[in-house]
């Protein structure tokens, strides 16, 4: 009877160990919040031959330099309308030459606007071996060899999961499943509403070390760097050379699909030599440009003199307006402190989304594996080694250490901002510190419970062997419970930070 209870307890604990080894181990290595923030960033080089941006986007003959447009695309001086808001329209824009970048990053700024609550069909960003000037896949050709990032506006499969951003790769032999929105072919996806936003929507697509990452700026703020995580695909192989492109299409419903800019950067890993610059211009061209610059400079100086003569009352500025007052300086310091807190919370939220996305994939794969083993191999015994258990314990210690570092950093930031606003008040800092202490105690309790389970089920004179896998329970599993506790803890920390910020912002008006 005791042996049966011990085997059942080990079988329930084993999925927890597997999940911790997969997700928390990766968390500590640096892919999540616990990563080293001082990791060197790749070198970025702007590639103008694979980019466009207004104003003066088109030439006198209506073409875009280094790009070819087809279908119903309409270039203008400040943007390219890839597909207008008319029924059954298709358009695309592609680079004329192939790019041969090992790692790259593109930043696309666009608008999708329409009258109705629902729009169609959508917009796609491409990296493909050949140009797909026209076709049925969002205005581009099917059977492409490369990757497409689809901003799908219309819900063809009726599952109410649109607008959505979907990453689909193809080797040139697979037809796109348009009726099901490519659900069975998607490598990764996220649901984001990119239609009718007050500011342009921005997409940052990075292909670095065989990993494709999509970040989205949802267009609610004018901040160009306010990106949030959307999707990531690891171990992705794409053609060594390919064309960048954008396409769009409309159906029975129609939206305007406008692309304001497409900026391409070549990435070079740290430690490697950056790409050699292009051939320098000749001396004759340099002299020509220098003469033009001097001519424009003289015209500018002349215009300045004319303006000063015509507006003598605007010359000069009172001395007291040049320097900021004590109140202005304190207000600026308060705003800067709040802005730093906002940026840190936003960065934590972005990294939390990436961690949750990875954990979601790990839990789903783990659940499928357990179901397969339980259904197909009911008599086979698993085995867990001492090394795996030690790895779990070390991982827990490392996570606790990093949570403590995060707590100290955020507590110090809150203390400084509260001190600037109310030097004599320490109640807000004490309350925040007390909340962090409570969170730390809860984490220690969870760690102690897991250690007790490990020690209780590990006799010193025998190696641990896992018994048969029990039938998959219908109630809440241990893995889902741990994930729920972790998510709830992180959300609680975020709520405390947000409430402290709101209280501090409210106090300064009294």
UniProtKB/Swiss-Prot annotation:
* Gene Ontology cellular-component terms listed: collagen-containing extracellular matrix; COPII-coated ER to Golgi transport vesicle; endoplasmic reticulum; endoplasmic reticulum membrane; endoplasmic reticulum-Golgi intermediate compartment; endoplasmic reticulum-Golgi intermediate compartment membrane; ER to Golgi transport vesicle membrane; extracellular exosome
Q: Where does a carbohydrate bind?
A: 88, 121, 156, 178, 251-253
Q: According to UniProt, where does the site described as Required for ER export lie?
A: 501
For region Mediates interaction with RAB3GAP1, RAB3GAP2 and UBXN6, the annotated ranges are 499-510
The chain's Cytoplasmic topological domains, given as residue ranges, are: 499-510
Question: Where is motif ER export motif found?
Answer: 509-510
GO MF term (any one): metal ion binding
Q: Briefly state the modifications made to the protein after translation.
A: The N-terminal may be partly blocked.
Residues bearing Phosphoserine are 425
Q: How does it sit in the membrane?
A: Single-pass type I membrane protein; Single-pass membrane protein
Which Pfam families would you find in this protein's record?
Answer: Lectin_leg-like
The residues that the entry says bind Ca(2+) are: 152, 154, 156, 181
Give expression by tissue: Ubiquitous.
Q: Which domain of life is it from?
A: Eukaryota
Name the PROSITE patterns for this protein. L_LECTIN_LIKE
Q: Which cysteines are joined by disulfide bonds?
A: 190-230
Per UniProt, which keywords does this protein have?
Answer: Disulfide bond, Endoplasmic reticulum, ER-Golgi transport, Golgi apparatus, Lectin, Membrane, Metal-binding, Phosphoprotein, Protein transport, Signal, Transmembrane, Transmembrane helix, Transport
Q: Which GO terms describe its biological process?
A: blood coagulation; endoplasmic reticulum organization; endoplasmic reticulum to Golgi vesicle-mediated transport; Golgi organization; negative regulation of protein targeting to mitochondrion; positive regulation of organelle organization; protein folding; protein transport
Q: Where in the cell is it found?
A: Endoplasmic reticulum-Golgi intermediate compartment membrane; Golgi apparatus membrane; Endoplasmic reticulum membrane
Known partners and oligomeric status: Exists both as a covalent disulfide-linked homohexamer, and a complex of three disulfide-linked dimers non-covalently kept together. Interacts with MCFD2. May interact with TMEM115. Interacts with RAB3GAP1 and RAB3GAP2. Interacts with UBXN6. Interacts with SERPINA1/alpha1-antitrypsin. Interacts with BET1.
What PANTHER family does the database record attribute to this sequence? PROTEIN ERGIC-53, VESICULAR MANNOSE-BINDING LECTIN
As for what it does, the entry says: Mannose-specific lectin. May recognize sugar residues of glycoproteins, glycolipids, or glycosylphosphatidyl inositol anchors and may be involved in the sorting or recycling of proteins, lipids, or both. The LMAN1-MCFD2 complex forms a specific cargo receptor for the ER-to-Golgi transport of selected proteins.
Name assigned to this protein: Protein ERGIC-53
| Highest classification ranks of the organism | Eukaryota, Metazoa, Chordata, Craniata, Vertebrata
